[in-house]
Amino acid sequence: MSSMTPREIVQELDKHIIGQDSAKRAVAIALRNRWRRMQIDEGLREEVTPKNILMIGPTGVGKTEIARRLAKLADAPFIKVEATKFTEVGYVGRDVESIIRDLADMAIKLLREKEMTKVENRALDAAEERILDALLPPARSFNSDAPVEKESAARQVFRKKLREGTLDDKEIDIEIKATPVGVEIMAPPGMEEMTSQLQSMFSNMSGDRKRTKRMKVAEAMKKVKDEEAAKLVNEEEIKQRALRAVEENGIVFIDEIDKVAKRSETSSADVSREGVQRDLLPLIEGCTVSTKFGMLKTDHILFIASGAFHLAKPSDLIPELQGRLPIRVELDALSPSDFQRILTEPNASLTEQYVALMKTEGVDISFSEGAIQRIAEIAWKVNEKTENIGARRLHTVMEKLLEEVSFAAGDKIRDSFEVTAEYVDKCLGELSEDEDLSRYIL
């Protein structure tokens, strides 16, 4: 679990997301509270439940990006899901409990990867010996020491070549674990747990069967190293630790929560939508979910929900669900100055990406300050005139702007190109002014 302070978390988020300070502060405090809870006495720790968050803001202002970046910072089991993927129990589709099952799967996978990284050097040594055994079968004669010494010397030569990579393309016959046959089972809704258990049963039927396969040394080394690493980690301990991590530090981000809200102006009963909200209630409040690894309590899992709420209102969510999301954060719509900052300030900004892409063709592309300003103005103007899709509009505008440069870059006609305000107006000015054209092209 991350021990970063709220200020450090916000500073890290600032590198990738422009503005939205209140949302950043809310998630930073929520993340830090996970760490704080683990420092207090065990008796009181059980009583401290996470304060779930509801993020409200128009599309394309950074809600999902905050979740993506938070996943990397959290160093805790994290899953992002769309509320629209789920249906009420009894309807065709996935039920909400599968969120927790997926979170458990992800936590085990992450912890397994961490543990395998710890034993990587030992696994590499064992894999090296197996590859050398395949390259140099042991000597048959045991009468004298000479052949053994000779073999040992040859082994050292091959070991050196193997480490240098000169044997990577050589083909060898190596005994590896047989890949279990994948069995696809179509199950009725709500039976995902039974399906996964049946699949694991079929895959375990092959047992530890091995087969000899011919492959290149580089490929064999990777497969054998993974096999050796798997032998060195304790799978049962990983499962127990991962489940504990999910229960204590798990974070679930539910996107598009507004799409399952019943709109106030429509009077028709939308059972499936409201049903999803009702099914989410026990999950967020705290219940026990059955997974293939054992029972899992959701009492201390942090839930962050987000939605644009441009057709529905937060008050259209059922009251019980509103009560379980006590912290409300509103994200601001983007201004032209925000668009300018988005183009230049974040790590791996949009302009930086295009510069790197064009550099691969030997073209040095640059953007003048005036060009950045015009691109931002056009993106904002098109959003105002047509549908407001936030920062995503910049992708459309940039792609249209650099279409000609990108197409001709492979012809090696020029070594450098500066995008100026005049060039932006020439390419996009007419399109942005004509509402009908911008609606379909930008």
From Swiss-Prot:
Alphabetized Pfam families for the sequence: AAA (PF00004), AAA_2 (PF07724)
Gene Ontology terms, cellular component aspect? HslUV protease complex
Q: What is the protein's major site of localization?
A: cytoplasm
Q: Which UniProt keywords apply?
A: ATP-binding, Chaperone, Cytoplasm, Nucleotide-binding, Stress response
Determine the domain of life of the protein's source: Bacteria
The entry's ATP-binding residues are 18, 60-65, 255, 320, 392
GO MF:
ATP binding; ATP hydrolysis activity; peptidase activity; proteasome-activating activity
Question: InterPro entries under this entry?
Answer: AAA+_ATPase, ATP-dep_Clp_protease_ClpX, ATPase_AAA_core, Clp_ATPase_C, HslU, P-loop_NTPase
SUPFAM superfamilies attached here? P-loop containing nucleoside triphosphate hydrolases
Q: What does this protein do?
A: ATPase subunit of a proteasome-like degradation complex; this subunit has chaperone activity. The binding of ATP and its subsequent hydrolysis by HslU are essential for unfolding of protein substrates subsequently hydrolyzed by HslV. HslU recognizes the N-terminal part of its protein substrates and unfolds these before they are guided to HslV for hydrolysis.
- Protein name listed in UniProt: ATP-dependent protease ATPase subunit HslU
